[in-house]
């Protein structure tokens, strides 16, 4: 059964397992890095699907994990709009829990962003400004998901939330992760939800909105390249 189709990859259900199968053109190093990220986050004790195997299926690389039976938080939010605030509360609580973890072997967020900014088509002056701002931001070592949005949370039948898709995970500043989530809502034309999210995140983490805002151009630039 096909669970999801994304660019360059398909996720299949196979009994109690989920297989994420990558196209032949997908870099092997990226696939192995994703598996390694997931294994490292697994060790924090967070609720995530466990990696069972990295293998090849019909000549294509695949990551095999435990299958989580349930609905994504995005689906639940669409089905029960009256519960939006309750779901958003849960969403931010899960993010705060992730950010409270440490995984010292994960790649560093700032290094990844610096590399991404250097790969953009932005002119040298803009790149310099962004890199200077990035260098001036405080160094933290929080576990950052990197693509934290409601479609990457599965709520199982018992109501337990699981976080999936750790391909972008790094260790770094939680406000950069929040800025990324805010931008994902905006890109999805959910402006009202984006504002609600930002207020809730800042309240729950006692973070100044201006501080998260300082990350927005850096995050936007680093996300503009794959």
What are these regions (language model features)?
Residues 81-110:
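Internal "kinase-insert"/substrate-recognition segments embedded within catalytic cores
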Residues 180-226:
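Helix-rich C-terminal or lid/interface subdomains of diverse kinases
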Residues 100-146, 154-157, 162:
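An alpha-helical support segment within catalytic cores of ATP-dependent transferases
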Residues 4-32, 39:
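ATP-binding glycine-rich loop module of kinase domains
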């Amino acid at each position: 059964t096909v669970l999801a189709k994304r660019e360059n990859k398909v996720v299949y259900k196979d009994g109690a397992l989920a297989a994420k199968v990558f196209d032949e053109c997908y870099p092997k190093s990226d696939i192995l890095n994703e598996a390694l990220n997931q294994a490292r986050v697994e060790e924090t004790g967070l609720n995530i699907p466990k990696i069972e195997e990295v293998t090849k299926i019909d000549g294509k690389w695949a990551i095999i994990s435990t299958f989580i039976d349930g609905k994504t938080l995005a689906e639940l939010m669409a089905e029960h709009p009256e519960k939006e605030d309750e779901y958003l509360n849960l969403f931010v609580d899960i993010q705060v829990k992730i950010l409270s973890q440490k995984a010292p072997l994960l790649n560093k967020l700032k290094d990844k962003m610096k590399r991404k900014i250097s790969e953009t088509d932005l002119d040298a002056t803009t790149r310099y400004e962004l890199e200077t701002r990035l260098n001036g931001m405080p160094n933290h070592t929080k576990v950052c998901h990197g693509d934290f949005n409601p479609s990457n949370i599965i709520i199982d039948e018992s109501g337990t939330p699981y976080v999936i898709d750790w391909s972008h995970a790094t260790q770094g500043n939680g406000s950069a992760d929040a800025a990324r989530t805010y931008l994902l809502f905006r890109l999805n034309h959910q402006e009202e939800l984006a504002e609600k999210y930002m207020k809730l995140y800042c309240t729950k983490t006692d973070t100044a909105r201006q501080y998260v805002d300082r990350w927005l151009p850096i995050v936007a630039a680093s996300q503009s390249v794959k």
